[in-house]
From Swiss-Prot:
May be involved in endothelial cell morphology changes during cell spreading. In the retinal pigment epithelium, may regulate the biogenesis of melanosomes and promote their association with the apical cell surface by inducing gamma-tubulin redistribution. The keyword Acyltransferase does not apply. It comes from Mus musculus. Keywords: Actin-binding, Cell junction, Cell membrane, Cytoplasm, Cytoskeleton, Developmental protein, Membrane, Microtubule, Phosphoprotein, Tight junction. Residues 1-20, 189-234, 250-299, 430-501, 612-643, 717-760, 944-983, 997-1051, 1086-1112, 1139-1182 are annotated as: Disordered. The gene is Shroom2. One of its GO terms (cellular component) is cell-cell junction. This is Protein Shroom2. GO terms for molecular function: actin binding; actin filament binding; beta-catenin binding; protein domain specific binding. Residues 1185-1476 form the ASD2 domain. Residues 1149-1158 have a biased composition (Pro residues). Residues 705-807 form the ASD1 domain. The modification Phosphothreonine is found at T963. Interacts with F-actin. Belongs to the shroom family.
Amino acid sequence: MEGAEPRARPERLAEAEAPATDGVRLVEVQLSGGAPWGFTLKGGREHGEPLVITKIEEGSKAAAVDKLLAGDEIVAINDVSLSGFRQEAICLVKGSHKTLKLVVKRKSDPSWRPHSWHATKYFDVHPEPAASLFLNTSGSPSWKSQHQASSSSHDLSGSWEHTSLQRTSDHFSSMGSIDSLDHSSQLYPSGHLSSAKSNSSIDHLGGHSKRDSAYGSFSTCSSTPDHTLPKADASSTENILYKVGLWEASRPGSSRQSQSTGDPQGLQDRPSCFIPRVPGNSSKSPRPEDNVEPKIATHGRSNFGPVWYVPDKKKAPSPPPLGLPLRSDSFSVAARGHEKARGPPFSDLASMQHFITLPHVQPRGDHRMETTDRQWKLTHLSSGKEIGNVGYQSEGHLDCRWLCSDDRAGRPSGPPGRLQFSDVHFLKSYHGSQHQQQCSDESPRAPSSPRELLHITPGGGLQEPPEPSQDDNPTQVRWPGSAHQKLDDRGRSHYFPGSLRQPVQGSAQVVIPRGDYWHSDTTPVDLEYPLLRPVGQRTYLQQHEETPASHEKEGYHQLNAGIEGCCSGIQEPPRASRTVRTGLQCPSNDFKLVDGESGRISRQRTPMLHSLTQDGTWRPGNSKDCGNDKPPLFDAQVGKPTRRSDRFATTLRNEIQMRRAKLQKSKSTVTLAGDSEAEDCAGDWRADVGAVPEGSFPSTYKEHLKEAQTRVLKATSFQRRDLDPTPADQYSGPSEHRTFDHSASSSLSSFPGEPDSAPRFCETGLAKAPSSGVGVPHVLRIGGRKRFTAEQKLKSYSEPEKINEVGLSGDHRPHPTVRTPEDTVGTFADRWKFFEETSKSLLQKAGHRQVHCGLPREKAERPQTGHHECESTEPWFQKRSLATSCGEILSDRKVEKASEKLNPPRRLGTFAEYQASWKEQKKPLEARSSGRYHSADDILDAGLDQQQRPQYIHERSRSSPSTDHYSQEVPVEPNRQAEDSGDHKEAILCTLQAEEGCSAPSAQPQDSQHVNEDTTFPQPETQLSSKCQHLQTSAMETSRSPSPQFAPQKLTDKPPLLIHEDNSARIERVMDNNTTVKMVPIKIVHSESQPEKESRQSLACPAELPPLPSGLERDQIKTLSTSEQCYSRFCVYTRQEVEAPHRARPPEPRPPSTPAPPVRDSCSSPPSLNYGKAKEKTMDDLKSEELAREIVGKDKSLADILDPSVKIKTTMDLMEGIFPKDEYLLEEAQQRRKLLPKVPLPRVTEDKKQDPGMPGVVSLATNSTYYSTSAPKAELLIKMKDLQEPEEYSAGDLDHDLSVKKQELIDSISRKLQVLREARESLLEDIQANNALGDEVEAIVKDVCKPNEFDKFRMFIGDLDKVVNLLLSLSGRLARVENALNNLDDNPSPGDRQSLLEKQRVLTQQHEDAKELKENLDRRERIVFDILATYLSEENLADYEHFVKMKSALIIEQRELEDKIHLGEEQLKCLFDSLQPERSK
């Protein structure tokens, strides 16, 4: 396999293409014998790689032919020309049975053929890995177009990469095992050579050992080849670094270098062997590489000088296969997920370099970046969310900082060949972190890689991938600040992968001593670019390096956390990162790159980043500012390296810490001061980057791994300052920063002058910085960084309120104080607890503050609320800073409110930018009433105050259903509501308005929010109540608005019509409709807002009823309560139907007065009052019950009938569960009542008016004891009473008072019976109306449906009526029998009991059979519905559904009314009979 010719595809590898074009030949191979064929395919167009054979199993059919070699590119299978897609090839291969005919394209130059890790293993490949690494770099097919100049490196990268990619796919399953990774093919697609691939790039060249691919896979973290990191894998940082090291070591001035000089691409390939690889894969690779352990291995290799020696691509790989250990290292790190973070940084560096070298492939790089991002994300998730999230974030930050610190501090960098593990790791981590931040942005990683490469280049001379292609400025590509380049490249790569990579690619790559490189290579553009990038990075880094020193201490953790944060915090950091990068590019490109980048950062792909980019990146005037800002970022990064040094070496750590601290202090000042200082800082950090202390690398690989693991574990413990919750005082403390002025005064404030680029970056990174404060750029990183580990992200979803706290802690904390590593080290659990406590206090305080400062907040926030406005007037970064400050900048009030509601202000760091950008989009904040969690939407639409003062509650990623929170959160946080009722209301209003604003996000957001806040809570409250109801309803009614209004109506368990409309106007409108139709039911529903029964009771007392949003008259409510008592179920339907009227055809207009009369205390209006309410106890009911108790106490004969405590089974009891409850029916029917409104009979109204006691009667009717007594039981009781001796009745016990009470009870029951009868009449009208609707539906169905379908419809309707009546009949009979059994004498005759038991058994069986019929009927209903759905319009279908559901409900309701009336009549009879003896006396 080693001898196999390179698989690099000429057309893919620019460098390979030229020489390979002639050297390429087609080989026809025919295999026979059937599967398995014994070869492995990798790459494919879907991965942006050539379809290459990466491995040939020994002793396999493929090996027996001797014509097939690893690295061969498959052109045709079974005479079918391939389009280049791997799946296509796999299908064709699988479709081959006995014979398989392959046509492969082979390069005649064996030096290009990657060695097979599979065949050679680590040890076998070691000698060739150097070559293969180199080859990988140049053999990356995808590099061809992108890096033609660097043909050798690219060719190697391409061919090797393809192999490794194939291996990657082969070994994705091996990601879980380090060993397997070692033996498995790289995860990265051909284009995505992982750093592992990189590490074993030599091996890769030899054949992309499984180990490489395994590492690649692992680093990809479950990113499958489908995610294919394009050439990034081939040009993974590790591979690149290794190759470069080997190449440079062997020939620092070798032809490759000279080639680099003469041939920018070629030279780039050499000096940035890694770069060439990256270009093809840089987009993808950077992230995968970041994830890939090979990167770790790379820096592991960096420890080995020989490894770094990479002979010319054409030369045989002389360096020992050190890549293996590196890969193992990287893999183990990746396996641990912590070290993996490290490795990725290194790979990222390489990939960054690749990106830089990849200028031509920029578009492609972007695509790859996307893929890479996905892989990266997957990697973080799969290979180690902790690592990916924490490790990468921390490492990423450290990486950048390290680069910066190395460059700035001028810290001696180990021999490039001996890239410090920390350096590589940081680079990779940083890259990863940034990458994570900008997962969607693929480019970010690439820059990291290039920078790493630069640092890694052996001989102390970093090969800085030139970026001429991108910027057409080789100097820029090679900016001495390798770190800058990495940061810049990464920044760009993330956002402008192509641009950064392209310059690197385009520009000649020259191995320059690190010190020289930093200085000589640096040009104004370089500085500016690096600075800009550093600014962005810094912004990003600041997030990472909020506490440089602490980061240094916890550097590794931070890196891990940073990496993790990158993954999890990608949302915000990526945005910052991207924005920063955009800004970075903008300086050199006048932000044109930003535009290009914005393309990458498309609204669809990366909406948040897109908005952020637009917000800050689009300001061309700040390119310098960005540059200036960036150095501070680097300074922040310098601070980070401190943590990293912790990981790597105390000396390095201390040195870096000191340098970074100084640099950051000066640079933060400089950033604020101006571009020149920033540039100086940039130069410093570049120098720091250039100098990579060798001491930074552990003496041994194991040590590195252990250290990395430990760091990563700590980092994954979420022991990050970013995540550590800050006391509420931090919020308050940051309040200064929260203020715009303060924010601006902070690093952001300095940017106002540099509003465009610098502010942007500041905003992304510095925006966070503002929260930390001017002097605390690192802190800013913490706050702004808000990178959440995978776990944290998960928690953000599982415990949204805490996720807010998590974010908040970082955001707020940053300004007030710089976190120490210890803070960061704090366990996530501790941090979480702290967050909870803090958030609670903060929420409470914030709520109060909001109440006090709601309006001011609006004003303060309005500037931000109008994001477009803010964008134009104030740098988006300011807004974002505010957001980053979690609204701290906005104002303490807002922050408080945000804290109060979301406690996300700290979290906002990551999503603050998103929110800011979202706000800019003017998406109205959906005031998630102090909900326990909010999504990005919530953050954006936190509320009026929140929106205005972007209390960026990074509740959750926008992906999370923030809108689903609704006011649900209100019930969830009753305490909060209680504490901050005002705020809560405000929040509710905000939410409601936010919803309303959603329709008009641009203009309304601010105004509506302000208006609502201004409205303050009185009016909003009503609206909120309605809106909240709507929201709550959407929220499954679980979250009811605190106000009783919103309490679910028992009738429907749903909020009133308000549910569907945000405006109370709608409610009023509905109410009007109801008035025309049956306002009472609707009103009842609304009144029912109160806790079910309580609200019902309150219905009895209109004063108790909460004001209806629709302004329902309490009298009407009272009437409703009375009426509802009469007719509950249908009323519910009617109510909903009434609600529907506005939607559906409105009921015939009836004089509102007619329904209004319902105020008449009886259910004069269509007794469309729900029985549920009727069943509710009213004052009259209570009085009746009291009378009944008194009477029963004195006249035991009436106990069974009158005693409310006596439980008698009724027909409805047995029907329970068979048919949906009223609320369910209403929900299903969707309040679509097409029935004509029924006007209460004038007679009924008159009667009610005539009888002042009617209301009481109605109430009585609802809860009268006889309601709970079935007619059958009443008869039974009467019989039993008749059996009793008259003495009991006529005993002289009964006094006149008892007779009076009985008479009162009789009167009460009589009134109730009158109400029930009226309700029955109304019900009959409803039944008629429903039948009329059914007739209409039937006519329509008959016209549109086929005869057989129409027959099914008619049969179903007919059976529905029959089954319902059958169930009712059986239930009634069974209830009577059971009541009789329960009321048997103590010594009943055996015959009687036995007879009753037998009847009970038979009836029970019949009842069960009827239930089965009902189930069958339900199935038929679904069938009929499906049939009708194909014919009927939506409206007609809704009518049908309403008709069917109402039909059964009305039948049941009718039966229930009949039973109640019968029972009442029997009760009256019993009472009259009991009075007879007394009267006779």
